[in-house]
């Protein structure tokens, strides 16, 4: 964030005592979509905040997830798994079981990552995952540059594109 950037909260999803809040950050000057990103805005950055709302009068920002190659756009939670459309970061799948505290990336809670770029895409090899929707063992990932990806969940630690 800071001067020269456009920043805002894009999404929030409540699951149990946590609310997962996705922030987006873009340069205030439009950039090319080299390496992925949003046409007209360029690369997205951002953080997924984890807010403990067990006491709604006193919410606490307790954990975060911030990959270096994407921006938290849309999230979906099913059980103890979070599915994240991470713009140029593609699809990310996180284990959100137990207590969530601190940096979820360095704790190894990312259990899967699928880069959704394709050489035949409207912007070749440039992932731009808009969301991730889980339903009946499949994750549906709409990518602005390369179309719809359907990923089968085989187990908590393996995904098959």
Roles of regions detected by a PLM:
Residues 1-161:
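Feature marking well-ordered beta-strand scaffolds used for ligand recognition
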């Amino acid at each position: 964030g800071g001067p020269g950037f456009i920043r805002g909260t894009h999404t929030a999803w409540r699951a149990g005592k946590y609310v997962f809040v996705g922030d987006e950050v873009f340069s205030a000057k439009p950039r090319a979509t080299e390496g992925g990103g949003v046409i007209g805005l360029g690369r997205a950055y951002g953080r997924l905040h984890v807010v403990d709302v067990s006491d709604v009068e006193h919410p606490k920002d307790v954990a975060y997830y911030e990959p270096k190659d994407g921006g938290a756009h849309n999230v979906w939670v099913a059980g103890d798994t979070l599915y994240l459309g991470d713009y140029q970061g593609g699809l990310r799948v996180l284990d959100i079981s137990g207590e969530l505290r601190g940096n979820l990336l360095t704790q190894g809670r990312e259990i899967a990552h699928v880069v959704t770029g394709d050489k035949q895409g409207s912007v070749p090899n440039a992932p731009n995952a808009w969301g991730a929707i889980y339903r009946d063992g499949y994750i549906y990932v709409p990518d602005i540059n390369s179309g719809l990806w359907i990923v089968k969940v085989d187990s908590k630690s393996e995904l098959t594109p």
